[in-house]
Amino acid sequence: MPLINLPEFASDLLAEFDARKVERIDTPVIQPAEPFLDIAGEDLRRRIFMTESETGASLCLRPEFTIPVCLRHIETATGTPKRYAYLGEVFRQRRDGANEFYQAGIEDLGDINIPSADARAIGDATGILARLLPGRRLSVTLGDQAVFEAVVQALGLPLGWQKRLIHAFGNMTQLEALLAGLVSPQFVTGLDDDVAKLVASGDEQALVSHLEQEMQATGYSANAGRSPLEIARRLKEKLILSETRLDDAAFHVLEEFLSLDVPLVNASAALAGFADAAGLKLGNALSRFNGRVAALADAGVDLSCLDYRAAFGRPLDYYTGLVFEVTVEGSAAVLAGGGRFDKLLTFLGATDRIPAVGFSFWLDRIETERAAV
């Protein structure tokens, strides 16, 4: 189906894609809803237009392109490395603006040279925007979820707390609430006395047996929800989380990390200084970060317009490392955004691990920026 009402610069954008030797790809507007509901993140989930098939399968209008492009790559059993470009409509419930709008972007799948692929994504995003917005100075904000994960792991927090904090990365309101809970733990309440004693005892088998008896007595079927073992382990995890307290020193370390906001050219030194002062070993996460900075310089990207903000993330759950957004300097409107999603294709059914990075353009915002000249 031909695209209509495309912005007038669409042909220039497609020419930029062609110059980068990427393969144009199209995906169906109607998509299976499950992948988006499972891994797209709460911010996107609540904006999805849902429907269902005659057989009751949950479907949705395409809310973004990364997941559909990855699904199409898996379905066609195409080899890697592979670079795809797309341009088409996405559909999201929004308070302001149209609920259907155009996005375009590039997904880079299977390049095992991670620093080079990351640098290429940022270079392509900024390079294309520079052609579409001549004379405008761009501003790029970078974050790195892998560095945050390394900090959280180095502090030795229980795995459950690590997962919670990592899941909240990029959402400062949620992250601050979790940190407040770590400083002043909220103990588990509302449990039956017998269940509470069994959870506290650590006797998993006894707790499972008790839960089985209670479920049988109340006529509750395990097929209708979690099994007794799953419930027991969930209760145990909740108890561990509720009893975990982050000491003042560790809390201040996290606060110090999340406050880092420096030009990218100074970021490697700032992270190394932070790690040394805190006595943390960030290992591979820091070396990968440094490799990306070097790759950006080697690719000729103007580092003077790039900033690193340790607390910066993007509201999509599938990101695993680099995240970035591009604006015109002095403007809050995000014109392009992207990041690395190395686990996404495996989650969607790929038999092999496929490293991946990509970005998308908001064409309506670019059009507005062009009109403001």
Swiss-Prot record:
Biological process terms in GO annotation: histidyl-tRNA aminoacylation; L-histidine biosynthetic process
Pathway: Amino-acid biosynthesis; L-histidine biosynthesis; L-histidine from 5-phospho-alpha-D-ribose 1-diphosphate: step 1/9
GO MF term set: histidine-tRNA ligase activity
Main subcellular location: cytoplasm
InterPro entries: aa-tRNA-synth_II, aa-tRNA-synth_II/BPL/LPL, HisRS-like_core, HisRS/HisZ, HisZ
Cell location: Cytoplasm
This protein's UniProt keywords: Amino-acid biosynthesis, Cytoplasm, Histidine biosynthesis
Keyword Cytoplasm: yes
One GO CC term on file: cytoplasm
Other facts noted in the record for this chain: This function is generally fulfilled by the C-terminal part of HisG, which is missing in some bacteria such as this one.
Assembly with partners or alone: Heteromultimer composed of HisG and HisZ subunits.
Job description of the protein: Required for the first step of histidine biosynthesis. May allow the feedback regulation of ATP phosphoribosyltransferase activity by histidine.
Family: Belongs to the class-II aminoacyl-tRNA synthetase family. HisZ subfamily.
NCBIfam families to which the protein is assigned, alphabetical: PRK12295.1-4
Protein's recorded name: ATP phosphoribosyltransferase regulatory subunit
